[in-house]
């Protein structure tokens, strides 16, 4: 399942082979979905796209609320959509926002780590620039029970 209907043909062509979804495509999917963000308080739209091992991609955006604690980030939206559809094996996460490159917040880092401790993360911007890292680099001392 892909969060943006324009990518349906890509999903069908590439399902089962996540290697065929390159970094630029995943970043573009994250960037394209940014327009759906609900961010009237920060005016800071963020988009995310998470690639599953079977080639399925889930997208997410930040959704704000007047009570900030009830807001959710794009990264967690994408992960929770995937998990709610039965996907648990994640390969790569792309996140985009305006500025130099977009970094996941601390809460997102913990959620990402718990669901995919080996995941690669692409932190990008609308101009196509990005930084490649891993969740272990971003959160070397993750909390665990």
Residue ranges: model-predicted function:
Residues 2-36, 85-145:
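C-terminal binding/interaction regions
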Residues 77, 81-85:
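Feature captures the catalytic cores and cofactor-binding loops of soluble hydro-lyases/lyases
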Residues 62-77:
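Compact, glycine-rich, soluble single-domain proteins
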Residues 58-60:
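Amphipathic coiled-coil signal-relay and dimerization helices
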Residues 43-52:
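Short beta-strand scaffold segments in enzyme catalytic cores
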Residues 38-41:
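Short Gly/Pro-enriched turn/cap motifs at secondary-structure boundaries
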């Amino acid at each position: 399942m892909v969060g943006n209907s324009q990518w349906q043909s890509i999903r069908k062509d590439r399902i089962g082979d996540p290697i065929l979804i390159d970094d630029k495509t995943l970043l573009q999917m994250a960037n394209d979905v940014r327009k759906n963000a609900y961010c009237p308080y920060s005016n800071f739209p963020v988009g995310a796209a998470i690639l599953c091992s079977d080639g399925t991609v889930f997208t997410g955006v930040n959704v704000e609320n007047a009570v900030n604690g009830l807001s959710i980030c794009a990264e967690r939206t994408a992960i929770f959509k995937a998990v709610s559809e039965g996907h648990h094996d994640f390969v790569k996460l792309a996140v985009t926002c305006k500025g130099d490159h977009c970094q996941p917040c601390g809460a997102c880092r913990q959620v990402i780590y718990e669901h995919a401790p080996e995941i690669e993360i692409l932190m990008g911007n609308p101009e196509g620039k990005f930084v490649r890292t891993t969740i272990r680099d971003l959160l070397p001392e993750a909390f665990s029970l």
